[in-house]
Amino acid sequence: MMRQMRGAAAVLALLLLAGCAGKPVQESPVATDEGIPAGQITLYGEIHGIAAIKEYEAERWKECYDRGMRHLFVESPYYTAQWLNLWMDAEGDEILEQLHRDWEGTYASGAETLDFYRTIKEQCPETVFHGTDVGHQYDSTGARYRDYLEEQGLTDTEDYRLTLEAIEQGQTFYRAEDDAYRENTMADNFIREFDALDGESVMGIYGGAHIALDGVDYNSGTVPAMAAQLKERYGDAVHTEDITWMGQSAEPQGTDTLTVAGK
């Protein structure tokens, strides 16, 4: 009887996570009180700058959030996510609007990006963002966050160290436009942030090329894609859904972040 009860609980946990992920997932042996298996990574692969995709992602995050998730990983630098976390606690939109100005000329420059983040703040106010990309906008967003920490007397903190590290990552990437370096760094940064959560499940939103479990980096094709590297480390805890098909007939706004060095 006890074995049957455990089996039923496991099935329930799987069904709950499947709703969050948008597709069936594999079994995990441990579940949280909310019914989501612990230590799971659900990644959505998008075409950047498509309103319908951002709306879909906001809906998927709301489902995850309602079932107990709080940590949302995004294809942004560490310091950008930290600004977003400060904005989540702020009354106004000044921080978000400044970030949006920093994103001018990139795929994040459209109104759909503002709508996405505002929806999350309104519907999922305890969301914690984690940025795992190299340091895009290092001389604007990155420098401003570094200066903010210095003004607050927080130079002897992990926050400050990771900010400087992200800035250096951006400078290294744009100096050589080394896509293999970026892909490996994204995986390393993801692992650092995920392992620090001590078993909590997370959702992530990245470009479609980064979440291919059998893929390689977008341009050089010389190293495994980020998700493939995560799969190697975490095995069946990694789940992906490619939603690029939703943007096949749509025209993204802006230009690729990779073409706007440090801006």
What is each PLM-predicted segment?
Residues 16-19:
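C-terminal motif of bacterial Sec signal peptides marking the signal peptidase cleavage site
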